[in-house]
Regions:
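Catalytic glycan-binding domains that act on GlcNAc-containing polysaccharides
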Residues: 1-146
Length: 147
């Protein structure tokens, strides 16, 4: 639910045209894709060297434009931050389960975005019944169609 809530917020605040390749490669925006990931995150994840070449930066920006890769990088970022905070790798955080989980989620979201109002918004989205409905109630089997 954390990744869904972060994506929900990031998509609402996305900049017009930032998903276009020429904008991504122009250098006008530092974060890219639905998860708003930057080149520095790839360095933290050891997917790029500390001083990437222009070719490596271009490769990274191309990957940021792929939504599936972008969301995978967000999940890896949260996993990396969890380990840096000393949280167990296999721990699934649930804000409704405990105050400590909610605090850990707030810390992770702050470290992702860096804005003080961000954790409260994300925690709110994680409790949003409509967002829960989209994820958990919207799964319906495909109808059988006979022709």
């Amino acid at each position: 639910m954390l990744i869904t809530a972060v994506l929900f917020d990031e998509i609402q605040h996305s900049k017009p045209g930032e998903s276009l390749p020429f904008i991504a490669h122009s250098g006008l925006v530092k974060t890219h894709g639905p998860a708003q990931i930057s080149v520095s995150e790839l360095i933290h994840q050891n997917r790029l060297p500390a001083n990437p070449t222009q070719e490596e930066i271009t490769w990274a920006r191309n990957h940021f434009l792929d939504p599936e890769m972008n969301i995978t990088l967000l999940a890896a970022k949260f996993q990396r931050l969890k380990l840096a905070l000393g949280l167990p790798e296999s721990l699934m955080l649930q804000a409704s389960r405990s105050y400590l989980d909610a605090k850990a989620i707030a810390t992770l979201t702050y470290l992702h975005n860096g804005k003080l109002d961000y954790p409260a918004r994300v925690l709110g989205y994680m409790q949003d019944p409509e967002l829960h409905g989209l994820i958990y109630d919207g799964r319906q089997p495909n109808p059988v169609i006979t022709v």
